[in-house]
């Protein structure tokens, strides 16, 4: 394989909802380019893209697959991305290192929630988009309705390049209004027959051709002037206008294919090879300092590692994009994130499960290598003259959590090591050894996401594991003012222990003024605050600690010990043992002994006094509340609303967005435990949602009673 220059390289991501045909399209592209002699299929489990055992088990893409084709003296690096929202990380990763996206639309359903999600990702990153309507041979396909929906969602920027003469089982021909030709195929597919457009299609074809010419001309002043003069553009001028429109996202070309029979795939690849922008034509990159980086093969070496794969018999395979310069076998580079030195071994062009050894890859190219010493996903490696870092890729917040444990307790350490290793492959899930919940929590994008994680642990790592519902990180607080005092006294010969603390607790809210007095037994006492400490608690909320002791009743040197005693107590609330938060404590009196008083004595006295006061101050349980956004087809809104109301959700608003209903709500974390499964079941997998922590709020009284009873029962069980 020859070395390709930056102006000969194009990087393309294949995006689309699950079942839209991306892997089948990838197989057809490889076949059309002569990379494979025979096409595989998802059903036969022999495609180039889906080759990991877990993908073969479930029949879905789990990881993004990188491959390349050589097409008309150009190199196309293509990444086949998972379609399920559970594996959204694959799409986001791929978009960060490619230069444009082909978004497939399932001809049976038209634009789906996943279509719009993918489009939003391209919008955020400013990537060109080509829409591709697939499965035109489905009897459910209504192409005109799909186009109308797309124009409603994306506006006039959606410009048809092609349209089918007929859809359903009779699909075998389409009209290309860029080339103004008819493409047709035999029923089994194969090479297209290219003919002039038949007379009965000419009026429609000319109308769409004119719209395409106008859209292309709008991207270049010279083309616009020529269009006004002659009302036409040559094919080359059309291509130039479309290319510029792609870069500025002012044109979203719409193509048609039946990927299963390779109908239209060759023409799509011609467009990718001849029209879409090269790496060198895209806007410049920026490093973490905001500096522009030109993808120049003569510049300093800089390589970004965007993906790590764990492959049988090989180990770690590290995938990278050359951001600047050129990388060769044996190059010595420095890891900008970890400070370590790395020597690059054999580098490869990517080909799914296979790799093609190469001597050099230039700026803009994508490749992989194996057995890196200390390189993790997201790291930047630099040569001399480059001191750059590129941002770690940002992923959506996890939406589904499970507590995980090894069936054999002796495998616990092995389980943690396996989880940390596997997270290098997929950074969209998080593992947390929670001291608070006394569980190992894994958080992912959905039930299917974590189910595949469990399968890989059991089949790849040979670990038997169980999932269970994670505990909820409740909090405790108080609702009224209370006072308590406690004397700690211990005498057993020699130096004893003595400390007495008098304090007041009350609810704390941001912005409330410090008190100037307090009332006890009907008598008002003036307060002289000597010191104030506001502690932002590690688990959220605040503790405000005021020292108002007068007359030297307690030395200031004991105040840190008193604060520590209170903090210790706040780690175990009296109702359920949960962390306490948002409390103001005023220490206003106490006693000490000239010999027996010490830090331990005052810490213990403060702990008991605070606990007694907390119990008298109307303690309540708080639960975490999350902001929820659902994207739901209108037909399912009634069922989704009903389900949310049964989950104690508070509906905040509804809106229409991109052909779907957007529903905003606030919902307790407890009620989100099975929401991913429920929403998928209610909508046939056609809805999606996002969550974000919002606040802690009081639980209803009946739920508080149950939580307290459950906690007491757990304590009794532990005591047995």
Language model features with spans:
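P-loop NTPase switch module centered on the Walker A-proximal segment
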Residues: 1-105, 109-111
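P-loop NTPase catalytic nucleotide-binding module
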Residues: 1-20, 107-312, 333, 367
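Amphipathic alpha-helical transducer elements in NTP-driven molecular machines
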Residues: 6-9, 23, 45-46, 59-63, ...
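Short, surface-exposed connector motifs at secondary-structure boundaries
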Residues: 73-75, 98-103, 126-132, 248-253, ...
